[in-house]
Swiss-Prot record:
Keywords: Cell cycle, Cell division, Centromere, Chromosome, Coiled coil, Cytoplasm, Cytoskeleton, Golgi apparatus, Kinetochore, Microtubule, Mitosis, Phosphoprotein, Repeat. PANTHER family: CLASP, CLIP-ASSOCIATING PROTEIN 1. This is CLIP-associating protein 1. Residues 662-785 are annotated as: Interaction with microtubules, MAPRE1 and MAPRE3. Interacts with CLIP2, ERC1, MAPRE1, MAPRE3, microtubules, PHLDB2 and RSN. The interaction with ERC1 may be mediated by PHLDB2. Interacts with GCC2; recruits CLASP1 to Golgi membranes. Interacts with MACF1. Interacts with mtcl2 and MTCL1. The lineage of its organism: Eukaryota, Metazoa, Chordata, Craniata, Vertebrata. It comes from Homo sapiens (Human). Residues 1254-1538 are annotated as: Interaction with PHLDB2 and RSN.
Length: 1538
């Protein structure tokens, strides 16, 4: 007999390894045969269980043969199911990722094969890789390596077009610093493979990732080797890595062939020629270590030793604690054998690799190890010292800034190792300090380093300046700001140091310091003697790499990429064409190998004004030439070119003597050669085709530049060369830039690109402002902000700043979109701004130094989460900069930041941190509002709570601003629902200030909401009732006024809905609201007859068709409905007369039929003529308001929306008796005379007079019952009732005996005497109990709502017997007429559950019986929707009663419906399972058992957070229930959870 799916599942789930090996091949054959396994494709549940079993039990098995069989079975399923296997990918991927790190080669290889097969047959590669990114951070190094190998295989199998590589590359970059060398090699190989497929764009992108130069050099060398080998398979159509914002947008498009024509050798030369100083790179440390002699170690040795430790497992935090205590005991006692101490130090690294940092208590224990580390670092055994330094370096590299306390404590001890004569100890200390500086950026380390810069030991001083240089290169400016003066003083002392090598290092430090704090650096420069100034200049001049000028290239603006970026990235990644060689007369290039720097000290304004003032600048400015300028000025720190001549772009160099007779190498741009052919290009410094947009394509279109035009003819040019922003053209006639000037050289209409200088403005050149012309064929001049071009002639004052500010107003653009989303234009990239901070203001202190992009989002978040207030402030600064640079956060980052912000709402440092937090919050909301829907509840409620706190006025204003931004940023309906939830939340106890804030917020929200945003839900009704109680708040007049205004605002917002909402509330609430609304209408009619909304300033323009459509209210079918004159907005005299006011309870007007109108008029025509009301009309409409609200039959939102969905209008149920269209003129009924010519009432007023709709059985269920209950109930006119309905409904109307009606009227009168006449009311209730058992349809149709409301009010009676009797009557009505409760379910359930709190057992028993009947009478889905929020928020015993009631409901609900509601049900039950009351816990378990009996194993995924013991208990009850019910022979079990 062929095995079926059930037997297959049983075989898969069995634990016996031998049997698994036997049935494995059978399962493969079975799944491969479509005929045998036909049911495989139909039973999705069984398939899910099968795949889950294979993934968890087979693929994760410890027996590699079982693992291989499991993969084979999965492979067969993939082959069989094809793309239908896509739903299972999420189940199998975690196991397959784990297997990538398996010890067996065969397992790893088969795993790779299976993954590729899934990408090929089940889903596209990107879908799979999106779910595999976590593997890059896997704790098993083989898995991390395997992920890289899998990426290589994917690229070779599917090509680069199938992947969005921009998502993957950052993860690979992280692995470049992995402790394991195999992982690092695999990461490099994967980058090389990406390069092979994508091309030069990868090189440019990596340059901006902030990677150490040594690593970049290694990677770029491999790139060059691949390119030389001819193995490149780049396609011009690859869009996956195309021109993301991090790729240089100035190069030609990918269709250009220039990228592959640049000689590889020149690229390598450029890369090596721009190597950063050796002290900061691994290569540098290696070479320096080699010079140290035998025994010296370097960073490479340390990194290898990081994971050269025994493997340990951490099973719990207790286990971790015991391990660290044992380590501390060994390390704290130097009497232990040195080998034990070495092993203890290694074990710390083992624990780190095993994930110790993920445990909360790890950092507490780490602090206790400070003393032990100090002792180890002082040990006489070099091996112990070496291991201690390695461990400290490892801690810093893994923990980053979290190692701050340990680093600060141990650093002085490590410095004492530096002068040690034992090389192993000295170099270990040096490498440890380097690693700590590189990974732990804590300002408190700076004084430790600077204090050692004055050490008596020459070796220590040299090393300290080297460390200081590394620190200035690696750290961000905001981390240094605190110690500017200390750094400046230390560098000054270093420049004067007695040791020549220390002085050299100090001069390097000066340039690093200058890149961060240019103004302070210039000040320092001027305090130096001339000999030291010359030494600094010669240091700059004689450098044949950028060793002496590590930061001249780096923007000190706000991105990590630009801060840590090597100079090799500064050339265009595609190279330049050789066909554009300059023809300008030249002299030979200097052969010294030093960089040729051109004159760039030309102020834009100086050049513009030089037409009228042609004079030599040497006599007027102290620094008239680049050579004479101080290093702090723009010229001397000039445009460091990266030997572009060698790549063939090349501009020739002419030597021209300057004012001082020195010979300067003048680089003439290619664009200057073509002035006549390209006027717009004159003066451009750029020679790349991607930058010279105008040169090869006929120039820019007219109007692209608003600056002074350049004449085509060179003869017509002024003798004063015109500075085109970043022009490199030099002349003795030009005026040098004064030292104190803060004017940048903004790029104007020409391309001053990123690769020529970071000082220049980076955003406004046409090279960035236009898409590549070779792709689109023409430029887009409109992209250049006019204010930027105008900068050429602006003064250096606020005019320029204003222009810059204007240009900065760019649309927000997300930063990390997939490669290929952007064109070559990177004007909106994060690296672009009108001018970088380096060029605009920061050099001479224009804008604060902390306005720079933070180096790493993770670090910013760590700062924000710090317990130290100053670090939190620092983190907020960094976050502000990230947000201002439009760096959007990933989903994971957003989640963490939301958690941090939630905690920050309670930050105690209000002035220091909370104020800045509020500023950051506003930016955060504006940028990420689309991703913060889930956090909106916390955001809104916390801000409102803060409005009730005692804050400074300035802070309070910021809270208010955050609220305003929140209100404008999120959907109004969502905000309104949250506020309703917040008001009814029993766990919240807002103070008076918070209440006022909530109410004012609702009022302002109501002004902007659409009527459809106001939803009449149970929460809204509860909230409105609470607001009504706030109108009588005895302690605060502000709360009373605000609550009244809110009620009026909601009434104005959606009058039909609000009126129906009031109709569902108890009479006491109705009375309070009705009185308020009466006064409001009365006052508004006195002050302005135009609109009742004037009292709260509501704008008439808010009326929309959805809001004002009268067809959504019962009014349209009654006396208050719209007449044709209302529809057309005419006066009454122009069309017809209107129905009279509802003068008497028994007067029955005939409603006009709107069928003809309905065909002719759309809802948009329904604008009310609210300007033509007078006070007499309003007063006449108020006569029956109280009774109308009281008797208004509440109808659910579903009933209201149903006809709207059908044709956009509410069907009018009442038509004239003969079926013809009724005349607009109304007939008088009951002796009431019609007043002629009165206009229709305003919709709001007429709705207050709405009569309750009748609930006739059958299709006429919404006909009106025009007879409100009143003292005159017995005077109703039967014939009038019959005229108000269809003829065919007459048979459904039963003649209610007069005595019954009289009896009911008397009973209701009696019951309305609350807390009085106890015995009489008991008799009335008993009489009513008898009537409920009789079939008196007419009575119930007329009086049901009144009876129900009176019964619910009676539940609050003083006499307990009355309360119990009322519950019995209510239960009897429920049993006999359950359908009538459909629209009153919420109110009835809540009142019944509240009765469970009663102190008398008799009442509680009656309440339990009523709740049981409710559970079996009301529709199950409706019942559960009401019960779920109560279970989650109510206290004992209400939550117990609600859970019991829900259990009964679950027993009668369909499986499909229950599955849909599980998401709402389970949280409350899990919460109940944790309740302190045992009865609540027990009820929750029974409810879960009931749910399991309905849906079975589908309950399993929802119980993931239950502990093992709770799962066992639940399983026990499930088995017991199954045994009792004998429903199943086998005891199905929910999976046990440990």
């Amino acid at each position: 007999m062929e095995p079926r799916m059930e037997s297959c599942l049983a075989q898969v789930l069995q634990k016996d390894v031998g049997k698994r090996l036997q049935v494995g091949q059978e399962l493969i054959d079975y799944f491969s045969d479509k005929q045998k396994s036909a049911d495989l494709e139909h039973d999705q549940t069984m398939l899910d269980k099968l795949v889950d079993g294979l993934a968890t039990s087979w693929v994760n098995s410890s027996n590699y043969k079982v693992v291989l069989l499991g993969m084979d079975i999965l492979s067969a399923l993939v082959t069989r199911l094809q793309d239908r296997f896509k739903a299972q990918i999420g189940t199998v991927l975690p196991s397959l990722i784990d297997r990538l790190g398996d010890a067996k080669d065969s397992v790893r290889e088969q795993d790779q094969t299976l993954l590729l097969k899934i990408m090929d047959q089940a889903a596209n590669p990107q879908y799979v890789w999106d779910r595999m990114l976590g593997g890059f951070k896997h704790k098993n190094f083989r898995t991390r390596e395997g992920i890289c190998l899998c990426l290589i295989a994917t690229l070779n199998a599917s090509g680069a077009q199938t992947l969005t590589l921009s998502k993957i590359v950052p993860h690979i970059c992280n692995l470049l610093g992995d402790p394991n060398s195999q992982v690092r090699d695999a990461a490099i190989n994967s980058l090389v493979e990406i390069y092979r497929h994508v091309g030069e764009r990868v090189r440019a992108d990596l340059s901006k990732k902030g990677l150490p130069q040594s690593r970049l050099n290694v990677i770029f060398t491999k790139f060059d080797e691949v390119q030389k080998s001819g193995n490149m398979i780049q396609s011009a159509n690859d869009k996956n890595f195309d021109d993301e914002d991090s790729v240089d947008g100035n190069r030609p498009s990918s269709a250009s062939s220039t990228s592959s024509k640049a000689p590889p050798s020149s690229r390598r030369n450029v890369g090596m020629g721009t190597t950063r100083r050796l002290g900061s790179s691994t290569l540098g440390s290696k070479s320096s270590a080699a010079k140290e002699g035998a025994g010296a170690v370097d960073e490479e040795d340390f990194i290898k030793a990081f994971d050269d430790v025994p493997v340990v497992q951490i099973y719990s935090s207790r286990d971790l604690e015991e391990s660290i205590n044992k380590i501390r005991e060994i390390l704290s006692d130097d009497k232990h054998d040195w080998e034990q101490r070495v092993n203890a130090l290694k074990k710390i690294r083992s624990l780190l690799l095993a994930g110790a940092a993920e445990y909360d208590n790890f950092f507490q224990h780490l602090r206790l190890l400070d003393g032990a580390f100090k002792l180890s670092a002082k040990d006489l055994r070099s091996q112990v010292v070496r291991e201690a330094c390695i461990t400290l370096g490892h801690l810093s590299s893994v923990l980053g800034n979290k190692f701050d306390h340990g680093a600060e404590a141990i650093m002085p001890t490590i410095f004492n190792l530096i002068p040690n004569s034992a090389k192993i100890m000295a170099t270990s200390g040096v490498v440890a300090v380097r690693l700590i500086i590189r990974h732990t950026h804590i300002p408190r380390l700076i004084p430790v380093i600077t204090s050692n810069c004055t050490s008596k030991s020459v070796a220590v001083r040299r090393r300290c300046f080297e460390f200081l240089d590394l620190l200035l290169q690696e750290w961000q400016t905001h981390s240094l700001e605190r110690h500017i003066s200390v750094l400046a003083e230390t560098i000054k002392k270093g420049i004067h140091d007695a040791d020549s090598e220390a002085r050299i290092e100090a001069r390097k430090c000066y340039w690093g310091f200058h890149s961060h704090f240019s103004r302070e650096a210039e000040h320092l420069y001027h305090t130096l003697e001339s000999s030291y100034q010359k030494a600094l200049q010669s240091h700059l001049k004689n450098s044949d790499s950028i060793v002496s000028l590590p930061q001249s290239d780096r923007s000190s603006s706000s991105s990590q990429e630009s801060l840590n970026r090597p100079l090799s990235a500064k050339r265009s990644p595609t190279g330049s064409t050789t066909s554009r060689a300059s023809t300008v007369s030249t002299k030979s290039v200097s052969t010294t190998g030093s960089l040729q720097r051109s004159r760039s000290d030309i102020d834009v304004n100086a050049a513009a004004s030089a037409k009228s003032k042609v004079s030599s600048s040497s006599g007027t400015t102290p620094f008239s030439s680049a050579a004479a300028l101080p290093p702090g000025s723009y010229a001397s720190l000039g445009r460091i070119r990266t030997r572009r001549q060698s790549s063939g772009s090349a501009t020739n160099v002419a030597s021209t003597p300057d004012n001082r007779g020195r010979s300067r190498a003048k680089v003439v741009s290619q664009s200057q050669r073509s002035r006549s052919a390209n006027p717009a290009g004159a003066g451009s410094r750029s020679s790349s085709p991607g930058k010279l947009l105008g040169s090869g394509y006929g120039g820019l279109t007219g109007g692209s530049s608003r600056g002074p035009p350049v004449t085509p003819s060179s003869e017509k040019r002024s003798k004063i060369p015109r500075s085109q922003g970043c022009s490199r053209e030099t002349s003795p006639n030009r005026i040098g830039l004064a030292r104190s000037s803060r004017i940048p050289r903004p790029s104007m209409s020409q391309g001053c690109s990123r690769d020529t200088s970071r000082e220049s403005s980076r955003d406004t050149s046409p090279a960035r402002g236009f898409p590549p012309l070779d792709r689109f064929g023409l430029g887009q001049p409109g992209r250049i902000p006019g204010s930027v071009n105008a900068m050429r002639v602006l003064s250096t004052s606020t005019d320029l700043e204003a222009a810059v500010a204007d240009a900065l107003k760019k649309p927000v653009r997300r930063r990390y979109e997939p490669y290929g989303m952007y064109s070559d234009d990177d004007a909106n990239s994060d690296a672009s701004s009108v001018c970088s901070e380096r060029s605009y203001g920061s050099r001479n202190g224009g804008i604060p130094h902390y306005l720079r992009q933070t180096e790493d989002v993770a670090e910013v978040l760590n700062h924000c989460a710090s317990s130290n207030w100053s670090e939190r402030k620092e983190g907020l600064l960094g976050l502000q900069n990230l947000l201002k640079s439009q760096r959007t956060l990933s989903r994971v980052e957003l989640k963490r930041l939301c958690e941090i912000f939630t905690r920050m709402f309670a930050d105690p440092h209000s002035k220091r941190v909370f104020s800045m937090f509020l500023e950051t919050l506003v930016d955060f909301i504006i940028i990420h509002k689309d991703d913060l829907q889930d956090w909106l509840f916390v955001l809104l409620t916390q801000l409102l709570k803060k409005m009730g706190a005692d804050l400074l006025g300035s802070v309070q204003a910021k809270v208010q601003k955050a609220l305003d931004v929140t209100r404008d940023s999120f959907p109004f309906d969502q905000q309104f629902n949250i506020l309703m939830r917040f008001i009814v939340d029993q766990t919240q106890t807002p103070n008076l200030k918070v209440k006022v804030a909530i109410l004012k917020y609702i009022e302002s929200l109501a002004r902007q909401m659409d009527p459809t945003d106001f939803v009449n839900s149970s929460e809204t009704r509860l909230a409105v009732s609470r607001i009504i109680t706030w109108t009588t708040e005895p302690k605060s007049s502000d709360v009373r006024k605000a609550a009244q205004i809110v009620l009026i605002s909601l009434f104005e917002l959606n009058t039909p809905e609000f009126t129906m909402l009031l109709g569902a509330l108890p009479k006491t609430f109705q009375d309070g609201a009705t009185k308020l609304l009466h006064n409001h209408l009365k006052n508004s009619s006195n002050t302005s007859v135009g609109s009742p909304s004037n009292t709260i300033g509501r704008t008439p323009s808010r009326h929309t068709s959805s809001r004002t459509s009268p067809l959504t209210s019962p009014t349209n079918c009654s006396h208050g409905g719209l007449s044709p004159s209302r529809l057309w907005g005419w006066s009454a005299d122009g069309l017809a007369k209107h129905p009279p006011p509802f003068s008497q309870p028994n007067s029955i007007p005939t409603a006009p039929s709107h069928k003809a109108l309905r065909r002719s008029y759309s809802p948009s025509m329904l604008d009310y003529d609210t300007e033509n009301l007078n006070s007499e009309e309003i007063y006449s409409s108020l006569r029956g308001v109280t009774e109308a609200i009281e008797k208004f039959s509440f109808r659910s939102q579903e009933d209201l929306n149903e006809p709207i969905k059908r044709d956009g209008k509410k069907e009018c149920d009442i038509v004239s008796r003969d079926g013809g269209a009724a005349s607009p003129a109304t007939e008088g009924r009951g002796g009431s005379e019609v007043e002629g010519g009165r206009t229709a009432l305003d919709n709001k007023t007429s709705l207050l007079n709405t009569q309750p709709p009748r609930a006739f059985p059958g299709p006429r269920a919404r006909d009106y019952n025009p007879y409100p209950y009143s003292d005159a109930i017995n005077t109703y006119d039967k014939t009038a009732l019959k005229e108000a309905v269809f003829d065919d409904d007459m048979e459904q109307l039963r003649d209610v005996p007069i005595d019954h009606s009289d009896l009911v009227a008397d009973l209701l009168k009696e019951l309305s005497n609350h807390n009085e006449r106890v015995e009489e009311r008991k008799g009335a209730l008993l009489e009513l109990l008898k009537i409920t058992r009789e079939d008196s349809l007419g009575v119930w149709e007329e009086h049901f709502k009144t009876i129900l409301l009176l019964l619910l009010e009676t539940l609050g009676d003083k006499d307990h017997s009355i309360r119990a009797l009322a519950l019995r009557v209510l239960r009897e009505i429920l049993r006999n007429q359950p359908a009538r409760f459909k629209n009153y379910a919420e109110l009835t359930i809540m009142k019944t559950l509240e009765a469970h709190k009663d102190s008398h057992k008799e009442v509680v028993r009656a309440a339990e019986e009523a709740a049981s009947t409710l559970a079996s009478s009301i529709h199950p889905e409706q019942c559960i929707k009401v019960l779920c929020p109560i279970i989650q928020t109510a206290d004992y015993p209400i939550n117990l009663a609600a859970i019991k009631m829900q259990t009964k409901v679950v027993e009668r609900i369909a499986k499909e419906s229950l599955l849909q509601l599980l998401v709402d049900i389970i949280p409350g039950l899990l919460q109940g399972y944790d309740n302190t009351e045992s009865s609540v816990r027990k009820a929750s378990v029974f409810c879960l058992v009931a749910i399991y009996s309905v849906i079975g194993e589908d309950l399993k995924p929802h119980l993931a957070q239950l502990t093992g013991s709770k799962m066992k208990l639940l399983n026990l009850y499930i088995k017991r229930a199954q045994t009792t019910n004998s429903n199943s022979s086998s005891s199905s079990d929910v999976s046990t959870h440990s």
